[in-house]
């Protein structure tokens, strides 16, 4: 471990301390991800309008379908009472997924556990969908009549 740190520290010694610390933090944080067993908590702020929630949910579910296949599995989803939670459930059903919200399913079914998080940040909304095998994220600009993607899709696959 010490040899590895010395190897990293040597090239960074020519940079100012703050830049070196930032680079090292980014490198080390790339090794972390959320626990895949804890994908049942979902959260979205209630102040996102229905049309904006529908636009975000529709876009994110279409991207999820590209990764796991359209309508090929039952999705286990713990929905909150926000407009986004309801819009996400409707979008999943629109893409042909069976949705269970009580976390109880038949033992022979293929289940995809799905969690979502919506965070307001700096005038935008950050949306994230997480499953045991893939995590999708994207930023949106929200208006009262809808939402527009303002970033590329972030995709992380798990082994």
From Swiss-Prot:
Location in the cell: Cell membrane
Lipid-conjugated positions (N-palmitoyl cysteine): 22
**Coiled coil residues, start to end:** none
Could you list the residues that carry lipid attachment of the S-diacylglycerol cysteine kind: 22
Main subcellular location? membrane
Mind listing the UniProt keywords for this protein, alphabetically?
Cell membrane, Conjugation, Lipoprotein, Membrane, Palmitate, Plasmid, Signal
- Please indicate if the UniProt record lists Lipoprotein as a keyword: yes
Q: Mind naming one GO cellular-component term on file for this protein?
A: plasma membrane
Q: Which cysteines are joined by disulfide bonds?
A: none
- Which positions make up the signal peptide? 1-21
Look up and give the membrane topology term.
Lipid-anchor
Q: What is this protein called?
A: Conjugal transfer protein TrbH
Q: Species name for this entry?
A: Rhizobium radiobacter
């Amino acid at each position: 471990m010490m040899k590895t740190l010395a190897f990293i520290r040597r090239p960074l010694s020519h940079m100012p301390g703050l830049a070196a610390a930032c680079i090292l933090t980014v490198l080390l944080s790339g090794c972390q991800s959320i626990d895949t067993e804890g994908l049942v908590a979902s959260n979205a702020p209630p102040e996102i309008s229905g049309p904006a929630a529908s636009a975000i949910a529709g876009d994110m579910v279409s991207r999820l379908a590209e990764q796991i296949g359209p309508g090929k599995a039952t999705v286990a989803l713990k929905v909150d009472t926000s407009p986004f939670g309801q819009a996400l459930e409707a979008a999943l059903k629109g893409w042909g997924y069976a949705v269970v919200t009580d976390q109880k399913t038949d033992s022979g079914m293929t289940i995809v556990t799905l969690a979502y998080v919506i965070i307001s940040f700096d005038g935008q909304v950050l949306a994230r969908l997480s499953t045991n095998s893939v995590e999708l994220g994207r930023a949106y600009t929200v208006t009262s009549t809808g939402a527009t993607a303002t970033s590329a899709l972030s995709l992380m696959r798990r082994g």
